């Protein structure tokens, strides 16, 4: 597969209610610069039909509003893959899987999760490496702008053209969550020990109250979102930490977080 022409990579952009011009233009420009085949499938009309079918008010920007978009995108990708004899490459990463920050059977699902064991902090380093390595100045600029763009699923309407839904404002800094995840999975440390190490590591960057707040969020989400990790597509194990239910992390979906919260 590594020997195939880059035009065999089908990049699909599916603008909808939350898409900003910045991310749309970056996606299109990046796809063209790397030599991929770009397809645009606007999904707003299809999602509005779905809203009518299930009786959902489009002005109700609840989780249903968001997840309908994510699942419509997955349906489009799956069907394009069937049509082109291809496979859907997942965009989710290890950090999102740990927090369950994905729509069940939406972006949570693919035919191969290539980033399944790559944490968000490493994704950023990889993008920067690609930007520094390329001789194409236009591509370099796009990649650096991607790094400067707030992480967002863009499922809620923008505010004055800017991203309104910022992931790290909602679930916390990924550098903290990736830190928590590593020490929990790699060494099996309990929350109290992870907290002490995090306070020393991030001294001067985050105060103890902030670290405690997001560690608590991490623990609650890690346990409550296991059901999404119990049915993951295949993906490679890149580092020492992964959450595959087949070879790395097996945990009942109804596991209780109470003991951890007491710690």
For each predicted feature, which ranges?
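ATP/NTP-dependent adenylation/nucleotidyl-transfer catalytic domains that generate, transfer
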Residues: 1-263
């Amino acid at each position: 597969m590594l020997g195939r022409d880059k035009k065999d990579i089908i990049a699909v952009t599916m603008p909808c209610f939350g898409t900003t011009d910045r991310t749309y233009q970056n996606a299109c420009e990046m796809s063209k610069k790397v030599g991929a085949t770009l397809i645009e499938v606007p999904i707003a009309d299809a999602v509005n039909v779905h809203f009518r079918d299930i009786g959902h008010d489009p002005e109700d920007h609840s989780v249903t509003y968001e997840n309908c978009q994510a699942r419509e995108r997955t349906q489009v990708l799956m069907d394009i893959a069937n049509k082109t004899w291809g496979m859907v490459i997942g965009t989710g990463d290890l950090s999102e899987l740990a927090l369950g920050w994905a729509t069940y059977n939406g972006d949570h699902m693919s035919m191969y999760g290539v980033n399944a064991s790559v944490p968000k902090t490493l994704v950023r380093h990889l993008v920067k490496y690609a930007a520094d390595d390329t001789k194409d100045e236009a591509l370099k600029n796009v990649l650096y702008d991607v790094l400067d763009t707030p992480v967002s699923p863009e499922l809620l309407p923008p505010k004055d053209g800017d991203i309104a839904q910022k992931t790290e404002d909602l679930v916390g800094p990924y550098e903290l969550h990736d830190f928590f995840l590593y020490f929990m999975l790699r060494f099996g440390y309990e929350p109290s020990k992870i907290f002490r190490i995090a306070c020393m590591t991030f001294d001067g960057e985050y105060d103890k109250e902030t670290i405690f707040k997001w560690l608590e969020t991490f623990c609650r989400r890690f346990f409550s979102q296991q059901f999404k990790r119990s049915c993951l597509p295949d993906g490679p194990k890149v580092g020492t930490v992964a959450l595959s239910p087949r070879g790395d992390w097996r945990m009942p979906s109804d596991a209780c977080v109470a003991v951890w919260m007491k710690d």
